[in-house]
């Protein structure tokens, strides 16, 4: 009888330890994993925004095509105004402005072309992975464009790139299924997108990220 009681106590201790872990430590572990993936996704979305902004500067519009954006980043160029010369202390004391110096040929402005990849991302940036959601096997960020007409009748080009929590945290669903469900439900109740996104297809928000 004594052995049976001891066995039950051991089993009870194991069950109690599991319950403590599930109620206290499991959410902490989930938050750590979520933060790790969110940080990587935010960095990716910032790079996407950077690429889209440069594409619009050159082409006058955003693109909803990953292939088009990748080709632009890999092979495209941007205009860069280079200034040759500067005002001397004597010229500044005499009241000469930079505009005056340009008109007199003392300062020259020359426009050159620089590679998008080198100037914005660096040569080691992997363009092919720009569309991929970090920590996933084959999940891809959504990318879309739209033209919104404001209340004053002005047409504004916009873009949006996003990833749902079910994609960002998909590799964790076996261990943290309920935590992911709870996170999505909280976002829904707060009227917010259950994931990370930059830009918007329905409003002009200066290509802001929903984490900012």
Question: Model-found features: residue ranges?
Answer:
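Hydrophobic membrane-insertion alpha-helices, especially the h-region
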Residues: 2-23
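A generic short-segment signal for beta-strand/edge and adjacent turn/coil regions
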Residues: 15-17, 38, 125-127
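Broad hydrophobic/π-residue packing in well-ordered secondary structure
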Residues: 6, 19, 55-56, 62
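Amphipathic alpha-helical segments typified by the pilin-like N-terminal helix
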Residues: 19-40
